[in-house]
């Protein structure tokens, strides 16, 4: 599995921002199970592409004694956020080791999110200099709603020519998420981040997801 993302960010000195993301990835799958007789194992492997885009907007409200307008300065903050994202998982055609032909359709996801981040920034410099480096730790939470649900049709053709199809997906609905993250602005143009979060809601539970990475601005 490998993927890439392109980011574009607009930021205002007073705390407003907008993030734009495009992504594409290749996802390899390996399947193993028993055929309809329950006697022979059936195996298959295939690859498929995925494409996505998202827009996120928000505003950071700073509060603390002696709070500074500069968003990197030492302070507590709360940041409401809104996001809309779309992802297309392309279908695939493949044949299992027992000769079963599978035609897997595309799956579409449209997800809306409303959330917040509550945290504390610790700046490197003082109020008298322009050092924009900082370290941040924060709690996050909110609600997500899946509008399309990833509905997908999968058709099967057996070695005897018999056909069948099933409808998969049904993950639309509302779920809640919560977690913690850390940000370290190493330089003006480079930032490291780590996040752990969990989701649960309608017919869906996602155990703790941990991500670590970096962002280079240019």
Stretch-by-stretch model annotation:
Residues 1-218:
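Membrane translocator/pore-forming domains, dominated by Gram-negative outer-membrane beta-barrels
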